Swiss-Prot record:
Residues covered by region (Disordered): 103-143, 439-459, 670-693
Purpose of the protein: Plays a role in photosynthetic sucrose synthesis by catalyzing the rate-limiting step of sucrose biosynthesis from UDP-glucose and fructose- 6-phosphate. Involved in the regulation of carbon partitioning in the leaves of plants. May regulate the synthesis of sucrose and therefore play a major role as a limiting factor in the export of photoassimilates out of the leaf. Plays a role for sucrose availability that is essential for plant growth and fiber elongation.
Assigned protein family: Belongs to the glycosyltransferase 1 family.
Gene that encodes the chain: SPS1
Name assigned to this protein: Probable sucrose-phosphate synthase 1
Higher taxonomy: Eukaryota, Viridiplantae, Streptophyta, Embryophyta, Tracheophyta
GO biological process: sucrose biosynthetic process
Pathway it works in: Glycan biosynthesis; sucrose biosynthesis; sucrose from D-fructose 6-phosphate and UDP-alpha-D-glucose: step 1/2
CDD domains the UniProt entry points to: GT4_sucrose_synthase, HAD_SPS
Subunit field text: Homodimer or homotetramer.
Keywords: Glycosyltransferase, Transferase
Coiled-coil intervals, chain numbering: none
Family annotation (PANTHER family): SUCROSE-PHOSPHATE SYNTHASE 1, SUCROSE-PHOSPHATE SYNTHASE 3-RELATED
Amino acid sequence: MAGNDWINSYLEAILDVGPGLDDAKSSLLLRERGRFSPTRYFVEEVITGFDETDLHRSWVKAQATRSPQERNTRLENMCWRIWNLARQKKQLEGEAAQRMAKRRLERERGRREATADMSEDLSEGEKGDIVSDVSAHGDSTRSRLPRISSVDAMETWISQQKGKKLYIVLISIHGLIRGENMELGRDSDTGGQVKYVVELARALGSMPGVYRVDLLTRQVSAPDVDWSYGEPTEMLTPRNSDDFMDDMGESSGAYIIRIPFGPKDKYIAKELLWPHIPEFVDGALNHIIRMSNVLGEQIGGGKPVWPVAIHGHYADAGDSAALLSGALNVPMLFTGHSLGRDKLEQLLKQARLSRDEINATYKIMRRIEAEELSLDASEIVITSTRQEIEEQWRLYDGFDPVLERKLRARIKRNVSCYGKFMPRMAIIPPGMEFHHIVPQDGDMDGETEGNEDNPASPDPPIWSEIMRFFTNPRKPVILALARPDPKKNITTLVKAFGECRPLRELANLTLIMGNRDGIDEMSSTSASVLLSVLKLIDKYDLYGQVAYPKHHKQSDVPEIYRLAAKTKGVFINPAFIEPFGLTLIEAAAHGLPIVATKNGGPVDIHRVLDNGLLVDPHDQQSIADALLKLVAGKQLWARCRQNGLKNIHLFSWPEHCKTYLSRIAGCKPRHPQWQRTDDGGETSESDSPGDSLRDIQDISLNLKFSLDGEKSGASGNDDSLDSEGNVADRKSRLENAVLAWSKGVLKDTRKSGSTDKVDQNTGAAKFPALRRRKHIFVISVDCDSTTGLLDATKKICEAVEKERTEGSIGFILSTSMTISEIHSFLVSGHLSPSDFDAFICNSGSDLYYSTLNSEDGPFVVDFYYHSHIEYRWGGEGLRKTLVRWASQVTDKKAESGEKVLTPAEQLSTNYCYAFSVQKPGMTPPVKELRKVLRIQALRCHVIYCQNGSRVNVIPVLASRSQALRYLYLRWGVELSKMVVFVGESGDTDYEGLLGGVHKTVILKGICSSSSNQIHANRSYPLSDVMPIDSPNIVQTPEDCTTSDIRSSLEQLGLLKV
């Protein structure tokens, strides 16, 4: 295309075009006035909205040649590429709009159905009192809870906490975490979150009423990181060690506990940690149980002191905290820090990667599912700002602000929520350590070039490093501290400064844009931002008025703030959107007024501190006017400074921790139920039948239920309206039904003659035997038929016949079948219940033990397990929703009245609602059902099993893998002594059986067809969570034999060769 030099001119003009035109009809006006410019049109209509730094980089490459013809060809190609990008962007925007519309319709439909279930008329209560009631989304820094506003208030609060001795567990598993000399910025995983969790742990450990805080993270012993990250334990020294030392005990204080998991000699990115989460959970569970027993000896009168809460930070730790919360039955808290759905939306808008590429790079779908599970399991979700709730959390299926408001109104009026739950959103801004901050006092007009009155205290070196840029260093400093990222909007700040002459005459501009050596060594994005800044400095001739030092240390940052305050300057954060804005709090603590973006967290900070002005980050003139107003107005500057210093204590760590502990105090206490009674069998090593019978009686006679609804009796609702008499009657009926059924099974078993095979070595003391086994073999093979399961079971038993006869190996059968189906299965295979120590039934919602001591039957149900997993169980409300969903699926997809799936009453139990699937191909994927239930605030674990022929819905924190952790907690059966046998695929809970500290044997050739059915439409690929090259996992050869299984066990070091 001849004459393409004109493209060069308008591409050059891109650098001067703002982020968008205020007048959408500007091009039409130009045409009407007869001054239409194709250059202007191209820039306005096609390029506007793209990142100008990227376009500039492409332009530089395109015009970097002396040959006019070659340059024209390059520019022509670039022109068409930009045009194509514009079309792709429009397409992506359309797809995004469709996604949002679909999500909105799904949410509105779910909200209508959820509201219809709650028949009582609470229209006034559901609307809420905006003035007097707590916000529907959580509490801001000025909520109804009393704040620390004076020393007296703090002392009063401290006196109220004196008698408490709380144990709190925090989890943050990625990055490099240590208490001192944190390597912030070393990589993308070691950033602000690391600093936040360390300071939170340290501050909580110093609070009255808190005995111990454990921050659990990953132990890293890689050669390319410091040795300190491999230390198992590190104590966090309190900053104010003299305040609460009187109450310190032997194991009290705050500690970093490093749990070994994942590759032992590698430091890996957080995206690669997902397959190793179960291993971390097992290691963390071991530590918490051990520490709870230690604290019990010190402060609990011999009874374990369980954590009052487990707090996960970021999605990976949230997933871990949910599993630990379920395993221990203690409350969970969650802080997202950065949310996956928001990141996914941003990446899709950038149009640089497809959805599949995004997931491959960031494992984003696994991360989103972990965040959804965190919403399911959390009592409280802690956020920094209201923006995080209103614009980020509302993207999730598991959180709906409108439905949350309705549920809260019902709870306040003590009306049943029909099994629906929504976590409490609490806005608690991060705290800050003020021990190193000394705000400037007195007259601020002193010299800045040195401290002549006190030569013993020279100015910090960073001051001279900044001052050398200025021709007049006495002018007030406008300070911006941000990395060179397009989102931080630094170029607009420089333009605002450069085009406002009064501002240039009154002030200097200091840009602290990270650390750099050479521009060529920076990332492409950072280099582009820096080059744009340098070009603007040259364009506006700002030499001598703008400082941009290359290096600074973390310890220099307070001195930089002090310099700006000393010169009566202003701190500015002009980011397009700021999730929180910790630098604004730091600036206020040093006596600096602020100018900040009106998008995001700064709004909440400004509401509390009232120490500056908010601006539209897209409005260059607004930024310049706000800066000029503060720099020129001495009274306004002084008032903003005073307000900031007066209110900054609201962002201190003691204030944060006080609100934090108040939130925890509002959680309903939960901990292992059997700890409330004298359970002699739990830790006893006795082999006597009496010990066994005491355990059996303890299980049989202590029924722990929270009953809601006519079928389940287990909603977990705080607002249950059942009377004590009804609860007792229902317990009695349930116990009698279980015992009567078990007697019938015993009679049938005796008639069939299947009791001939009795383990003579275990004798009567079945439960102690479970704990004395050298190894426990867990058969979790999900076959398409009972014949396949029976064949696999017999092969496994025959492979270790000698060890089984000696009593060193015990067996657990873990399936999706009911106990009745298991009994029929055992009879058909001529097996005895006594061949197994325990039975995990209904995908992990029921736990039975075999026994020969009781005349009531061969199976004993563990009712304590029910109380352990009943958290947030939806009961009858959940069942009705599932029945309605099944009917809708049939109406939508079935032809000629055929049923797709139907409720299976005979397969359902109090904690498992089962559905028989007649048309597996027409059944929606498991992720769709999970979504439907989450939108309606129903928290449960949906499992497609038996190759898609059955759907089991069980409590949200129940599973077959969690049942194994319960056995460890309840009976002390070491997880490392367990061997789990699985097929090549299995039910949709298959992935949970693979990871962990237990050993896994994959039986090749078994369940190989299941993956084509129920794993085809997963939210994320199974490969994202499969531990690769784990020493704990072995595979047998295809069509494994008994000898193959034994060889695999020898390979794991479990059997002697």
